[in-house]
Amino acid sequence: MLESKMKLVGKIREAHGLKGDLYVLVFSGEIAWAKRMKTFGLKAKDSDEIKTFTVERTKPFKKGLIVKAAEVADRTAAEGLEHMEFFIDDELMVSKPGETIFLSEIKNFKLKNPEQTVLGEIVGFSSNGVQDLLVVETTDGKTAEVPFVDAFIKKIDFKHQAVVMDLPEGLFDIENA
């Protein structure tokens, strides 16, 4: 499996039970993609190789999920995979129409105001504990964090790769002060 087609979403926290189940700590806590997952990849931190495993079953658990892989026969084998990085096919991180989007889907989109003026480019994401934040490189080369909340979002335009937001006046001025 190529890492470019895989997305790091968590790590194997520990073996779970006697039959080779794995407890995967998912960094975001969001596991809507788990039901569609047919394979996953594991990689040791000191390695470049991602080994592919076949999913037998999954179930939500704590801040992640329990996964049973066909290739992991028992607890001893599962313990040998503890602390490995957990990757999924990046196609699982694409929302369907009407679903909540994954933030990674709008990375590198332009941020525009309702008048269609480009305010910057979405270069990353952060959180203030209450809400997701878009990390935006503004047109003057500065960086601003913009709350990604329904009250500000007017449109997410996948065709033109733009997010249109009606932001409070002066938000960028406050960020860049």
UniProtKB/Swiss-Prot annotation:
The PRC barrel domain binds ribosomal protein uS19. This is Ribosome maturation factor RimM. It holds the Pfam family PRC_RimM. Binds ribosomal protein uS19. The keyword Signal does not apply. GO terms for cellular component: cytoplasm; ribosome. The gene is rimM. The keyword Chaperone applies. One of its GO terms (molecular function) is ribosome binding. Belongs to the RimM family. PANTHER family: RIBOSOME MATURATION FACTOR RIMM. Keywords: Chaperone, Cytoplasm, Ribosome biogenesis, rRNA processing. Residues 98-171 form the PRC barrel domain. SUPFAM superfamilies: PRC-barrel domain, Translation proteins. An accessory protein needed during the final step in the assembly of 30S ribosomal subunit, possibly for assembly of the head region. Essential for efficient processing of 16S rRNA. May be needed both before and after RbfA during the maturation of 16S rRNA. It has affinity for free ribosomal 30S subunits but not for 70S ribosomes. Its main location: cytoplasm. HAMAP family: Ribosome_mat_RimM. GO terms for biological process: ribosomal small subunit biogenesis; rRNA processing. InterPro entries: PRC_barrel-like_sf, PRC_RimM, RimM, RimM_N, RimM_N_sf, Transl_B-barrel_sf. Gene3D superfamilies: PRC-barrel domain, RimM. It is found in: Cytoplasm.
